[in-house]
Amino acid sequence: MTNTAARRSTGEAQLLPLPSIYSLTLDELKEWLVAHGEKPFRATQIYEWLYGKRVTDFAEMTNLPKRLREQLASAFSITTLKTIVKQTSKDGTIKFLFELHDGYSIETVLMRHNYGNSVCVTTQVGCRIGCTFCASTLGGLKRHLEAGEIVAQVVQVQKALDETEERVSSIVVMGIGEPFDNYDALIKFLRIVNHSKGLNIGARHITVSTSGIIPKIYQFADEGMQINFAISLHAPTTELRTKLMPINKAYPLPKLMEAVRYYIEKTGRRVTFEYGLFGGVNDQLEHAEQLAELLKGLKCHVNLIPVNYVPERNYVRTPRNQIFAFERALKKHGINVTIRREHGHDIDAACGQLRAKERKEETR
């Protein structure tokens, strides 16, 4: 049994830490300061220390009065994540397995592109959606992450990039968990990382993906955010989608498409449909024709995903020539489509794989 598993089984490290200051929006921090007799402008100074200088100790915030630094230290923590495993791929992709205060672990991935560095963040410890092709759902949902724990992932990766004077240029919320199942923390996270005084990641450089929790799609559309939005679709018909994604029983495909149309009409923004290709399951030309019919007339983009092999699942990769044929079939119908570039194929880069491997080690 590893130290992580031992802590969870014995109760060690189970004491709740102080609330993470990373969980506070700038307005919430201003409110806290005013309530404690301080000027609201101090919030901007604190944000600069947290997200500009990325300090991890309130004592280092030297332009704040000592009394305020002490008050902050007694009221909040600055979340730091312990790196358990760090895997680096030949293509530069880096996968981190971070340990949380209670011993649970989460994954965060840094992906290198010719246009910058993208971070894929996790929103939950585990997942309850139950997609039959995904390693994230193995073991079920353990708990939601606090907004500060999601923010801390980006900060941690940015600190690693500081060593080479690089920066995080985009964020994808596509790691372990269903973001809309942890909606309030997600929205707070988005507001913090997008804020010009926070991590200052432009809204159009942030993408949120959902498996299709329909009420939250309507709510997200009404938020008025310019965040990129993606649907994990993976099947063009109700029957096939239900086999791949049990959530389709609760939120069936026709209703999902109604919600997508509402989102497009409300925001004027394009929706991306993620479509993982599984050999012999959803990758035939008839599936491409069905998908084109489903998406006809929509302001959308299809992202075809060559799937990573997951040992605990039985799906196999679609051959490259078949992926290209699928792409051509969609283009023939005027569908905007790309094939996702593979990242970290030589490491445990599929969502949840590294954490699943760690869980196996813990049970030995």
From Swiss-Prot:
- What EC number(s) would the UniProt record show? 2.1.1.192
Q: Which terms in the GO cellular component ontology are assigned?
A: cytoplasm
Catalytic machinery residues: 107 (proton acceptor), 351 (s-methylcysteine intermediate)
The protein's location, in the record's own words, is:
Cytoplasm
The cofactor note reads: Binds 1 [4Fe-4S] cluster. The cluster is coordinated with 3 cysteines and an exchangeable S-adenosyl-L-methionine.
Instruction: Alphabetically list the UniProt keywords.
Output: 4Fe-4S, Cytoplasm, Disulfide bond, Iron, Iron-sulfur, Metal-binding, Methyltransferase, rRNA processing, S-adenosyl-L-methionine, Transferase, tRNA processing
Q: Which reaction does it catalyse?
A: adenosine(2503) in 23S rRNA + 2 reduced [2Fe-2S]-[ferredoxin] + 2 S-adenosyl-L-methionine = 2-methyladenosine(2503) in 23S rRNA + 5'-deoxyadenosine + L-methionine + 2 oxidized [2Fe-2S]-[ferredoxin] + S-adenosyl-L-homocysteine; adenosine(37) in tRNA + 2 reduced [2Fe-2S]-[ferredoxin] + 2 S-adenosyl-L-methionine = 2-methyladenosine(37) in tRNA + 5'-deoxyadenosine + L-methionine + 2 oxidized [2Fe-2S]-[ferredoxin] + S-adenosyl-L-homocysteine
| Residue ranges constituting the Radical SAM core domain according to the UniProt record | 113-346
User: InterPro entries from the xrefs?
Assistant: Aldolase_TIM, Methyltransferase_A, RlmN_N, RNA_MTrfase_RlmN, rRNA_lsu_MTrfase_RlmN/Cfr, rSAM
Residue positions annotated to bind [4Fe-4S] cluster are: 127, 131, 134
Requisite cofactors: [4Fe-4S] cluster
- Disulfide connectivity for this sequence is 120-351
Please give the superkingdom of this protein's source: Bacteria
| Job of this protein | Specifically methylates position 2 of adenine 2503 in 23S rRNA and position 2 of adenine 37 in tRNAs.
Note the NCBIfam families from the entry: rRNA_mod_RlmN (TIGR00048)
Kindly give any further remark recorded in the entry. Reaction proceeds by a ping-pong mechanism involving intermediate methylation of a conserved cysteine residue.
Family label: Belongs to the radical SAM superfamily. RlmN family.
UniProt-recorded name of the protein: Probable dual-specificity RNA methyltransferase RlmN
Q: Source species, please?
A: Geobacillus thermodenitrificans (strain NG80-2)
